[in-house]
Amino acid sequence: MRKIIHVDMDCFFAAVEMRDDPSLRDIPIAIGGSRDRRGVISTANYPARRYGVRSAMPTAMALKLCPQLKVIPGRMAAYKEASQHIREIFARYTPLIEPLSLDEAYLDVSDCQACSGSATLIAQEIRQAIAMELNLTASAGIAPIKFLAKIASDLNKPNGQYVITPDQVLPFLRDLPLSKIPGVGKVTAKRLQELGLITCSDVQNYSQAELLKRFGKFGHVLWERSHGIDEREVSPDRLRKSVGVEQTLAEDIHDWESCESLIEKLYIELETRLRKVRPDLHIARQGVKLKFHDFQQTTQEHVWPQLNKADLLQVARTAWNERRAGRGVRLVGLHVTLLDPQLERQLLLSWE
């Protein structure tokens, strides 16, 4: 049985700022763009979160919720430096490290002999080392499979950890809301609820064939996760190639204005996700996906050096006008393809 740890730093960007400037510790702060430039919040500290300030929220909205909020533009070099130090701490225990972003990673410690092989104690030591060496806090989840380790890391935040042992997997899943499973968004959760599927135990008693019929490949993933199946390995060589966000609509849309409004909202989430893996927002290309009421779909892409909303809207408008053929749209998605590190320098120079 594998031993997987998911480590997630606590409000990482904001925590680095509070560490380096103690005067910020007890006041609400957020990292993000300015209100004048229609900026977006990347992360907020816990005092700010008490006012309802959240990541991916427009800065203007955050300031309405919390007028005294101090918005900081961010220092990506400092965040990268801290992230590298954290990964060096991970490497003391295992070479099997799969970074998800600057502030979170999976570790497979199945063969680690430290702490007598106890994943719980290894996670505790890692968190203590981060606190002592960087003066930052981290939370951790420990489980025999990846998605449960990720869920567990959120259960004792901040500065805590949660363990799900192999014999606790099925009891833990029994009452777990399906909305906690990665990939189940608000619209999917609503569709599941309409079928009477609210917790994993509901799916355990539901027809797998019916799930496949209604949700396609994701229905299979949902069935597996609800039964405690996740065979994905921790992959240290995994190179993230893309970042995306999409939304399935409760009702089809038929007018461009509705699509444009949805893209405006999705763009905020896409920018937030991309900034966690590419703080400079440099990309190889960006694109739009439209899925129609007959479940046919189309993808339109454009080579572009940096995430750009105006270009995405133009690409989407082209797809809407040329490929919709009067059909209602049931899903809208945005995505970017990341630069190949080996080609990044040449590609970026060609755009200068």
Curated annotation (Swiss-Prot):
Enzyme Commission number(s): 2.7.7.7
Cofactor: how and how many bound: Binds 2 magnesium ions per subunit.
One cellular component (GO) term of this entry: cytosol
GO molecular function term, any single one: magnesium ion binding
Record key words, sorted: Cytoplasm, DNA damage, DNA repair, DNA replication, DNA-binding, DNA-directed DNA polymerase, Magnesium, Metal-binding, Mutator protein, Nucleotidyltransferase, Transferase
Native organism taxonomy: Bacteria, Pseudomonadati, Pseudomonadota, Gammaproteobacteria, Enterobacterales
CDD domains (alphabetical): PolY_Pol_IV_kappa
Name used for this protein in its record: DNA polymerase IV
PROSITE patterns associated with the record: UMUC
UniProt domain UmuC: residue ranges: 4-185
Main location: cytoplasm
Cofactors, names only: Mg(2+)
Site (Substrate discrimination) location in chain: F13
Family statement drawn from the similarity comment of this UniProt entry: Belongs to the DNA polymerase type-Y family.
Stored PANTHER family: DNA POLYMERASE KAPPA (PTHR11076:SF33), DNA REPAIR POLYMERASE UMUC / TRANSFERASE FAMILY MEMBER (PTHR11076)
Subcellular location: Cytoplasm
Function in brief: Poorly processive, error-prone DNA polymerase involved in untargeted mutagenesis. Copies undamaged DNA at stalled replication forks, which arise in vivo from mismatched or misaligned primer ends. These misaligned primers can be extended by PolIV. Exhibits no 3'-5' exonuclease (proofreading) activity. May be involved in translesional synthesis, in conjunction with the beta clamp from PolIII.
Catalytic reactions of this protein: DNA(n) + a 2'-deoxyribonucleoside 5'-triphosphate = DNA(n+1) + diphosphate
Xref: NCBIfam families: PRK02406.1
Binding of Mg(2+), residues: D8, D103
